[in-house]
Amino acid sequence: MEVTMEDRSVKADKADRDDNNTTSTELLGKMRQTKVISTNQNNNHLIDRMVSIYEMEMIKSQSTETISDVSDVLEFTVIDNCSHGTHTLEHDLRLKGEPIGKSESVKGVSRSLIIQIGMTVIFCALEFITGVVCSSIAMLADSYHMAADVMALIVAFTCIKIATRPSTRLGYGWVRAETLGGFFNGIFMCTVCVLVFQEAVGRIINVHMITHPLQVLVIGFIGLLINLFGMFNLSGHGHSHGGGSHGHSHGGSHGHSHNNKKTKKNDGHGHSHANGHGHSHDGKSDCNGEEEPDHTRLNGKFRSASAMANSDANVRLLDNDDNSNDIIERRLSGVNSQNTIIATVDRQMTPYGTHMASEVLNVSSNNLDKSAQKTEQKKDKNVNIHGVWLHLLSDAFGSVIVMISAGFVYFLPTWKIAAYLDPILSISLASIMGFTAVVLVKTSGEKLLKQTPEGLDLEKVKKDLCSIVGVSKVEKLSVWTLCGQRIIAAAHVNICHPAVFPEAAYKIKNYFHDLGVHSTTIEPTFEDTCMQSMRIMVKKVVDGKSIEEPVSVSTENEITE
């Protein structure tokens, strides 16, 4: 893509620097102001989006002679004639962008797991010995289950420990190890169910009466107490409750530029999937309900350093010019005075040229009304700890079954059905364990496969995104669960032009925050048709006085494939 409009003031600045390079030290302070006006906005919601471009250049020479500062101002008025500038639909969204509250004590969970592992190992050995000596299939089954619990607890403890470790190879670190641990816990439970069922069927065929039922009854009671203690100890960690606000990691991956031209070495890049996920460009959603041809993919990255920190939004506009002297840095102040953009653009480009890769970092959320923050606490299920809790629950049922079967044998030794009660109750235990195991495997498996959260309508989300000013189409939308209630969203959207992208990205982030989405990745593609409909009014001002008549420049013929 090429934009041929010349920035004559920049060339003049370059010539002045060449003349004075060997004679003086010169400070050039130039300010460019750009006003973006959409002619299609509703009169009741007319907003003049202001973008100020500042350029400061320091040039030092060998001479000690100085001259007075020179201050030039270039005013660009961009008139947007595209059909995506109305605020009526956007107003219906009632965007708030409230930060998501979340807190969880990993240290407390680790301590609880260590205590539970120690007690479970000791009692597992005690149950196994008692089951063999007393010929109790329920006791042996419970000891097998305890052995599976030991493995599950070790997996849970390991996952929680490594989940907080940083990683340079994994996009989200080891945080998904919790979900993986929950999946393996479910597999362990399924294995135990098969073993218990097999032993119980064999005991029905070959009947064996429990010997020393009193000892079995006492051991079962101790096991019940241990399991109840573990369930109570971990029940406070199975969910994390809203309380403190936290930073959001908006480290977004970006797409790719479909350009046949040979780019520089510095600009050539593939996919940088910092978040560990890719994008496909099928399933396009046009805001007008029509399919449009693909445009040049202009790649963006959206991430936030902290939801409550005062940080700036940064945009780097990359070009293909080999001459580094033809690159200038501009500082753009966005619609919100707290939001800023750092840009690097080619001198030959208009302020809103189409060949660029945009990287938007954080937009401050200090302007949010803290009194409007969510007071409703959201329960966040930790799949890994929830899996351990299910193990302990089934163990508690197992201990109850052991006590029932041993109690009947102890108090009714002549009752013939008491011999069959032990294996029958063991089959019931296996059935309960199997049900909980299937649910756990299904839940963790869905999260590992990045399934869309239940109850979220992607088509409605696409329609809402198209209501935001400057968004013309949603090319691709993916929403999935990282772990617990940490939901990730990746949206490939078509934007009218770069002038409205920072504001649109800020509103898209707020929209997803209102949905409870933890992290948002935005990949923009700028519309050629909207770019061509823009008109730019250029006026040069020196010391507050206009020295040139406004010149109307149309971008219609400036963009060539």
UniProtKB/Swiss-Prot annotation:
Extracellular side: 134-136, 198-215, 413-420
Subcellular location per the Swiss-Prot or TrEMBL entry: Basolateral cell membrane
Biased composition regions of type Basic and acidic residues, renumbered to the chain: 1-20
One term under GO cellular component: basolateral plasma membrane
6 X 2 AA approximate repeats of H-G, as annotated region: 246-270
Stored InterPro entries: Cation_efflux, Cation_efflux_TMD_sf
Membrane-related topology note: Multi-pass membrane protein
GO terms assigned for molecular function: protein kinase binding; zinc ion transmembrane transporter activity
GO biological process, one term: zinc ion transmembrane transport
Family matches, as Pfam families: Cation_efflux
Basic residues biased stretches: 247-264
Residues in the signal sequence: none
Entry comment describing in which tissues the protein is expressed: Expressed in intestinal cells. Expressed in the vulva.
PANTHER family: FI23527P1 (PTHR45820), ZINC TRANSPORTER 63C, ISOFORM F (PTHR45820:SF4)
Assembly notes: Interacts with lin-45 in a zinc-dependent manner.
Function: Involved in the regulation of Pn.p cell fate determination. Involved in zinc metabolism and the decrease of the cytosolic zinc concentration which is thought to modulate Ras signaling. Involved in zinc transport from the intestinal lumen to the pseudocoelum.
Family: Belongs to the cation diffusion facilitator (CDF) transporter (TC 2.A.4) family. SLC30A subfamily.
Name this protein carries in UniProt: Cation diffusion facilitator family protein 1
Gene from which this protein is expressed: cdf-1
